[in-house]
Amino acid sequence: MDQEGGGDGQKAPSFQWRNYKLIVDPALDPALRRPSQKVYRYDGVHFSVSDSKYTPVEDLQDPRCHVRSKARDFSLPVPKFKLDEFYIGQIPLKEVTFARLNDNVRETFLKDMCRKYGEVEEVEILLHPRTRKHLGLARVLFTSTRGAKETVKNLHLTSVMGNIIHAQLDIKGQQRMKYYELIVNGSYTPQTVPTGGKALSEKFQGSGAAAETTEARRRSSSDTAAYPAGTTVGGTPGNGTPCSQDTNFSSSRQDTPSSFGQFTPQSSQGTPYTSRGSTPYSQDSAYSSSTTSTSFKPRRSENSYQDSFSRRHFSTSSAPATTATATSATAAATAASSSSSSSSSSSSSSSSSSSASQFRGSDSSYPAYYESWNRYQRHTSYPPRRATREDPSGASFAENTAERFPPSYTSYLAPEPNRSTDQDYRPPASEAPPPEPPEPGGGGGGSGGGGGGGGGGGGGAPSPEREEARTPPRPASPARSGSPAPETTNESVPFAQHSSLDSRIEMLLKEQRSKFSFLASDTEEEEENSSAGPGARDAGAEVPSGAGHGPCTPPPAPANFEDVAPTGSGEPGAARESPKANGQNQASPCSSGEDMEISDDDRGGSPPPAPTPPQQPPPPPPPPPPPPPPYLASLPLGYPPHQPAYLLPPRPDGPPPPEYPPPPPPPPPHIYDFVNSLELMDRLGAQWGGMPMSFQMQTQMLTRLHQLRQGKGLTAASAGPPGGAFGEAFLPFPPPQEAAYGLPYALYTQGQEGRGSYSREAYHLPLPMAAEPLPSSSVSGEEARLPHREEAEIAESKVLPSAGTVGRVLATLVQEMKSIMQRDLNRKMVENVAFGAFDQWWESKEEKAKPFQNAAKQQAKEEDKEKMKLKEPGMLSLVDWAKSGGITGIEAFAFGSGLRGALRLPSFKVKRKEPSEISEASEEKRPRPSTPAEEDEDDPEREKEAGEPGRPGTKPPKRDEERGKTQGKHRKSFTLDSEGEEASQESSSEKDEDDDDEDEEDEEQEEAVDATKKEAEASDGEDEDSDSSSQCSLYADSDGENGSTSDSESGSSSSSSSSSSSSSSSSSSESSSEEEEQSAVIPSASPPREVPEPLPAPDEKPETDGLVDSPVMPLSEKETLPTQPAGPAEEPPPSVPQPPAEPPAGPPDAAPRLDERPSSPIPLLPPPKKRRKTVSFSAAEEAPVPEPSTAAPLQAKSSGPVSRKVPRVVERTIRNLPLDHASLVKSWPEEVARGGRNRAGGRVRSTEEEEATESGTEVDLAVLADLALTPARRGLATLPTGDDSEATETSDEAERPSPLLSHILLEHNYALAIKPPPTTPAPRPLEPAPALAALFSSPADEVLEAPEVVVAEAEEPKQQLQQQHPEQEGEEEEEDEEEESESSESSSSSSSDEEGAIRRRSLRSHTRRRRPPLPPPPPPPPSFEPRSEFEQMTILYDIWNSGLDLEDMSYLRLTYERLLQQTSGADWLNDTHWVQHTITNLSTPKRKRRPQDGPREHQTGSARSEGYYPISKKEKDKYLDVCPVSARQLEGGDTQGTNRVLSERRSEQRRLLSAIGTSAIMDSDLLKLNQLKFRKKKLRFGRSRIHEWGLFAMEPIAADEMVIEYVGQNIRQMVADMREKRYVQEGIGSSYLFRVDHDTIIDATKCGNLARFINHCCTPNCYAKVITIESQKKIVIYSKQPIGVDEEITYDYKFPLEDNKIPCLCGTESCRGSLN
C-alpha cells in the first residue's frame, strides 16, 4: 500500500484489505475542519480514521447485478389480422372512403373529425402520384365497424370546409381506387369525381381487352386471379358474387352499385359485402345479404335496389369471362351452387365449368330480358329463401336448400368441384338428387328460393340477396337509415342516372307522391334499356331459361327483402321493379309507380290503400289455389303494399299462367296495422300533424292495436311464425289478406317446407295479387301471375332449348315498347295536364272578366254542362283509356283497384284548394289559403287508414274518388278510340271547365245572395270568388283532383247525396245540376255497378236547399254525400223517421234521394271515395246542436231561413275548442290541416248531426254499410269530393243545412251581413258522456268521426226554435227563393251551362211550391259519427302527451262508475275505488299583450311583406329618455366645486399672461396647449333630438371656454374625396370630415373622439376654431355662451352653398332649413 495513501502519519490498518476508497480528501474539500486529513475506507467497512463519522456499507453486492434498476414497460400490441387477398370470410366494414374533400383537410383534421364516431386506426389522404396534390380522397380505418358506420351515417353529404363530402363504407378501398384512377387519369377533378354509379361504371366499362388487362392486373389478388380472364372460375363460396369482382355488381355489399369497377383493384373479392349482414352466414353461402347490417336499416328503396342490384351482379364491365352474366346469377349461385362466377348464371347451375361468356349478354336483349326476368323473379321468389334465415351458415346451405328446393333445384345448388377457395373451409354441400319436378318451395327455376337471389345463381343458390331475403327484416336496417354506407356501396355511389332529365322528373314526381302512380319510373326504363349496355345493371347476369335450373334460368333478383319483402310481401309486383339506380329508391313493393320513392315516413304514414282485387274478374284458375296460408291470414290488412313500379311480362315463350280466383273483398282496414312504434310514429306523423308521442303513448297504442287485431280475429289464423324472426313488428306493410290468393300455387303446396318456414318466408315473398292494379306496371292480368308462367316456362324450356333466347328477345322488345309507351304516355299526360290547366285558367279568367250573364245564358250553360256530364261515364273513360294504350289495358287497373294506381297527375301548383276550402272561400267571399299540395298528397294515404277502398264498411279515400274522376277525365283526353265515350280532349277539358263554371256559378250565386244583403261585400266577394273559382278551375285540370273534382265531384257526391248539404258553396249549384245529370249517368257511367240510379225526380228538393243556403254555409263536401238508403229511386220513402239502422227518411219530396239505394249492402266493391275533407260534417262545419226532433233535417229545409235569424248558442265541443293539441288529437288531421281552417273556426255543426252522432253507434253500422255501398252506385265519375261520413246521417240533413247552422255559418261568413237573432233559445243540459262502447267503436265504424263531446251548454233544439218562429219560415223561404234566383241570374258562367241553370231553378221552384208548409216530422234520433279506432286510441292515450285535464278526469270517472254498475264480469272493479288524480293538463292563458309591449303589429301579419315600420318621434318619445339618470343626478349635484376649479384655472391663466407681459404671446402654441390641457370638459354622447346621436355637457361650461378638440386623421383633400366615396358605398351616411384649411381635412369617421357627435344647429352654442400647436393645426370647439348640464353641444357646420340641399333638423326659430 502506498504510504502516501495514508498520508500524514495515517497508519494503514493492520488487516489485509482488498479494496479501499478515499472518502474524504482535504485538498478537494478545504472546508473540512480537519486539515490534511484523508479518510479511507477499506473493503467498504473499515476506515482509516477510527472516530470516523461515516457508516460502513452494509449490503455488499456485485455492482454488475442491476437488481434495483427499474423495469421498463414494453408494450407489445396484439397484432391485428391484415385483410389481404388471401383473407376468407366477411370483411368487416371498418374502412371508410371519403371523396370530394377540401384540399385543406389533412390527416389530423380528418382524424379528429372521425374520432367522435369511433376509434380511428389509420388515416390516409391520397395525393397525386406525381404532383403530390390533394386528390380530395381519404381513407379512414376504424377499429370497429360501428365507428365506420356511424361516421358514414353522420358525415355523408355533410359540408366540411365548404365542400359537400361523400363518405361511404368501402371494402378494401375498391371505390376509393376507382375514384383515384378517375382523378389521376384526368377524367375528373377531385370535386367532380362521380360518386354515383352510372358514370363511374361506364367510365370503367371500357373495351373487353382493356377490361381483361386491367382485370388481370387487378385480380391478381382476388380469388379468381388464378383463372385467365374469360375462363369460368369456380365460384368461391366466399364470394357473395363470384362474378368478376370488377363487375359493377360484384360483391353486393359494396356501397356503390359498381362496387368493383373495372379498374378496381378488387382483391377482397372473395368476400362479398357480407359484413353488412347481421346474420353470421358464412361468406361462402353468398349470404352477403343486405339485411345483415343491423346498425341501421337501409332505406327501403336503396336496400331493395342495392340488394337486388348489387346481388344481381350483372355488370358486363368485367373481363369477358366474368362479365355481368356470370355475376348476378352466379353471384348468388356461387355461394351455394358454387357455380363459377361466370358460369353459374350463364351455364346450367350444375355445370359451373361452362364459361360465362356464353351468355355474357353479348346480345343486348339478354340483359334487358334479364332485367325483366329479375324483376319478375324477385316477385316470384319462393320460400326457400327462408332457409338462410333459419340456417344462415353457408356450409349447411346446401342441405337447407336440398330440403327446401326440389331435388332438381338442390342439384344445381350442389357445390362445384372446382370451387376455388370454397373447399378449403366449406364442406361441399351434398349433391342433390337428379332434378325432379320443382316443388313448391323450389318454385320455378331461378325464381325458386335460392334462385330468387338477386343474381342468385343459376340454380337458385341463395344469392346474397336471396339470403338477405331470408334474413329477417330488421326494423332499422342500415340502408334505411339513409346512410349510404351499410347499404352496400350501391348507395354510396348514387347513379348518375339521376342526372338524366327523365329520372329527375321522375324524382320530382315522386316527391309529389305519385300523381302518376301508374307510370313506371324512368329509372327502371333506363336501367332496362341500359342493362344491355356496358353498365347494364342486370345485364348478362341472369339468363332466363325455360329449364327450371337450366343454363339459362335467370335467378330471380328479389328486391331487397330486408325492406321490401316485409313491406310488400304480399304484392304481386312486390319487388318486380327493376332495381333502381342507387339513391333512387326502388319502389319497394310498397311503392307504386311514381310512389316509388316513399321514404320511411311515407312508408309508415301513407301506404296506398290496398288495391281492391275483386274488381278484376280473373278467369277461373286452372289449379285453384288453396286458401291462403295461415301466415297470410294473420297479416295485418291495413297497409296494402305499394304497388310495384311495374311488372315485366313473363317471357312470351311460356304457357299462359293459370288464373287465380278473385280474392275476396278485403276486410275493412284497421289502424292496428302499425306493427311497431316506428310505424305508428310514421303514420302519426302524417296523420296527426307530427304530434309528439311519448313512449307510454306509443306502447299503449300498440298494445291496444294488437288487442284490437286479435279481437277482430285478424290474427286468428296467425299460424305464421309467432313473433318469429320476422314477427309482424318487422313488417312495415304486411301483405293484405287478399294477397294470399295471389300467391303462386307452389307457395301453397309447400312440401316439406313446413308451415312455419313457409309463413316466415312468405312474409317476404312478393305475393302476386292477381287483382292488384299494379298502377305503374305495364303488366297485364296474366303477367300478374308470373310464378305459374315461370314454372310453365321452365317446363317448356326443357323442351325448347331456344326458348330462353326467344324469351329474352321478346322480353327485350316488349320492354322497349313498354318503356317507349310509358315515356310517350308520361309526356302526353304532362302535356295534357299542363294544357288543361292553362285552358282552365284561361277559362276562369274569362269568366271572371265577363259581366254577370243573364239568366238565359246561365241556363243554357247549365244544360250544356249537364249534357257534358251525361256524356262522361267515369268508369268507361278509364276502361277506354286503358284500351287505347293506357299502360296495359284494363287488367292493369283491375277495374276499381286499378284506379288507385291509375293516372295520378302531378300538381303544377304549389298550393291547391280542397273542395271544402273552395266552398268556404266562396262562402266567405275571399279565397282561403289553400292547403299545401304536399298535404293533399299525404291525404290519400292518411285516409287509407280510415277506410281502404273496397273494404266493407269503409269509405274509400277521397283521393281515390278524385283520382277515379280525374282519371276518367284525363284519360279521356288521351283515349284513342273512345268506343262510346268522347275521345276528344275537349270533352274532358270542357267538363273541367264546366265544373269550374259551376264553381263560378255557385260562387256568383252566393255573391248575388250577398248582394241582396250587402252589395259592397258582394262585389268584393265576387272578385275574390272568381279568383277562387279560377283557382279551382286551374287546379281542376292541373291536378285532376281539386277544381273539377271539388265541384264535379262534390256535385257528384251530391248526386247521390242530395247536394243541399253540399252547400259547400263551390258545389252547391253544380251539385244540384250534377245530381240530376249524374244520377242518370250513373248506370252507364259505372257498368260494374249493378244498381242504376234513376234520375232524381224533378221535385227533388235537396239541391234547392243546398243552393239556397249555400251562400251562408261553408259546409264540407262530406255532407254532400249523405248515406241514402238505397231503395229504388222511384219509391218515395215514408216521411216518418226510419229505424236508426238507416238514415231517417226525408219528406216525400226528398224521397228519391233517400231511397235511391237499397239499404242492404250490395256485394259490389265500393269505388274509392275521396278523402274526407274534415272529419265529418259535424266536425268542422257546424256547431253541435242538441237532439232536435227527427224532422230536424226536414226542418232545416223548410225552416232553413228561419234558423238564420235564430240566435245561436254555440255549444263548446271538442270541435270548436281552440286549436290546441287535444283538439288536434280528437279530430282527423285533415280537419285542421286540409280543411284549410282550424278547428276553432269550424264551429258549425248541425243540430241533427250533433244529435245523430250522440245517439250512439246503433245507427253507425247501417250508416257504414250504406256509406261503403254508396260509391258503388255512384259511378266513379260521380264520386263526391268530400263525402264525409257525416253525410251518412240522413240525406235530408245533408241536403239542407240546419237553419241554426246557417246562422252560425253566417256569423262566420265574413262576406255576409249577419241578421240580428230574434230570440234566445233556452239552454239545454249537457249531453251525457259517451258510453264506454262508444269509446271503442267497432271496426266497421272506424271510418266515421267520433261522437262529439259537448263541453258547454247546448242550445235548445231547433224544432223549438222553429216553432217559436213559424211565421218567419215562410218569409225566409221566399227570401231564399229570391236569393237563389238572384244568385243564379248573377252567376257568370259560360252560356253552355245556362240552360242547366234554368232547368235547375225551375225544378227548385217547382219543388218549393209543392213543399207542404206542414210542420216537419220529428227530428231523427241523434246519431254521431263514431271515431275510428285509431282516432279513438289517439285521443284515449293522448293523456300521455298532453296530460290529464278536467274533462278527461270527469269522463274517466264516469266510465269507472258505469263499469261499477255493470255486472258483467268486472268483479275486480269492486275491489277498486276512485282516487282523484292531479290535473296535469292545465292551459295557461296567453298573457294579453299591452299596446306598449313593442312595435305595432304589421297590418298584413307578415314582417317580410312590409319590413319595419318607421317609428315616429312621438313613438320614440314614449320610451326614449334623452337624459339618463346619471346626468339628472349630476344636475342636483354640487356644481360649485367645478366652477371654483374653473375660475382658479382662469385666474392662473391670467397670471401667466401678465407674467409674460406681451400680447404676442397670446397666440403662442404654449398658451394654446395650456388651454387645451386645462379646459377639457366632461361630456357624454347620447340620443339627440336633432339627429341621431349628439354630444351633451355633463358640467356647466362658461362662455369662451374650450369644450373639446375635434380629433381625427389628418388627410389631404384627394384622400378625403376618395374616402367620402368609399364611405357612401359602405353605407356610412354621416360625414365626419372636418376641413382645417384648403388642403387639410380631419377625418373622424373611423378614428376620433366624442367631438364627431356634435350636431349642426343654425343657432349653435359653440364654435370651431383652428389653432396651431407644434406646427400642427388642430380644430378646437369653444363655447359661445354658457352651457348648462345636459345641454346639447352644437355648432354651425358652415357647409358651402350647394344646389343639393341637406335639410337641417335643428328646429330652432331661426333655422335656415338646410346645412348648405
From Swiss-Prot:
Domain Post-SET: 1700-1716
GO molecular function: histone H3K4 methyltransferase activity; histone H3K4 monomethyltransferase activity; histone H3K4 trimethyltransferase activity; RNA binding
Family that this chain belongs to: Belongs to the class V-like SAM-binding methyltransferase superfamily.
Ranges annotated as biased composition (Pro residues): 430-440, 606-631, 638-670, 1130-1150, 1413-1424
Gene disruption: observed consequences: Mutant embryos fail to gastrulate and die before or at 7.5 dpc.
Presence of keyword Magnesium: no
Domain SET: start-end pairs: 1577-1694
Biased segments, Acidic residues type: 991-1009, 1018-1027, 1283-1292, 1369-1383
Domain RRM positions: 84-172
Biased composition (Basic residues): 1399-1412
Binding site for S-adenosyl-L-methionine: 1693
Reaction(s) the record says it catalyses: L-lysyl(4)-[histone H3] + S-adenosyl-L-methionine = N(6)-methyl-L-lysyl(4)-[histone H3] + S-adenosyl-L-homocysteine + H(+); N(6)-methyl-L-lysyl(4)-[histone H3] + S-adenosyl-L-methionine = N(6),N(6)-dimethyl-L-lysyl(4)-[histone H3] + S-adenosyl-L-homocysteine + H(+); N(6),N(6)-dimethyl-L-lysyl(4)-[histone H3] + S-adenosyl-L-methionine = N(6),N(6),N(6)-trimethyl-L-lysyl(4)-[histone H3] + S-adenosyl-L-homocysteine + H(+)
Domain of life of the source: Eukaryota
Motif HCFC1-binding motif (HBM): positions: 1307-1311
GO cellular component: cytoplasm; euchromatin; histone methyltransferase complex; nuclear speck; nucleus; Set1C/COMPASS complex
PANTHER family, sorted: HISTONE-LYSINE N-METHYLTRANSFERASE SETD1 (PTHR45814), HISTONE-LYSINE N-METHYLTRANSFERASE SETD1A (PTHR45814:SF3)
Native organism: Mus musculus (Mouse)
UniProt entry tagged with the keyword Phosphoprotein: yes
Protein name: Histone-lysine N-methyltransferase SETD1A
Gene giving rise to this polypeptide: Setd1a
Enzyme Commission number(s): 2.1.1.364
Role of this protein: Histone methyltransferase that catalyzes methyl group transfer from S-adenosyl-L-methionine to the epsilon-amino group of 'Lys-4' of histone H3 (H3K4) via a non-processive mechanism. Part of chromatin remodeling machinery, forms H3K4me1, H3K4me2 and H3K4me3 methylation marks at active chromatin sites where transcription and DNA repair take place. Responsible for H3K4me3 enriched promoters and transcriptional programming of inner mass stem cells and neuron progenitors during embryogenesis. Required for H3K4me1 mark at stalled replication forks.
Gly residues: compositionally biased ranges: 441-461
